[in-house]
Amino acid sequence: MNKKLSIIFLIFALIASVLCSAEDPHLFHSSSTTTTTSSSGGTSGTDSSINTGSSYSGSGSGSGSTGGSGSGSGSGTAKWK
């Protein structure tokens, strides 16, 4: 159970990292980012996000060698500086 929770936490951490480091909304262009992570402990996950200039969305999923799996998604709107 702890491994399942750690996988879910890793996924949400990746999503938060991608969303927080997204490009400046003043640029008004689209970009897409996909990040894949894996470790020797048997866990792996994929996180992706889309930046359209003023809004952001992301999703992620992961699975563990012990049979646990998790997924998450998030979205937000950029605020002008």
Curated annotation (Swiss-Prot):
Residues 59-75 have a biased composition (Gly residues). It is found in: Secreted. This is Uncharacterized protein DDB_G0283449. Residues 29-81 are annotated as: Disordered. GO terms for cellular component: extracellular region. Its main location: secreted. Keywords: Secreted, Signal. Residues 1-22 form the signal peptide. Residues 30-58 have a biased composition (Low complexity).
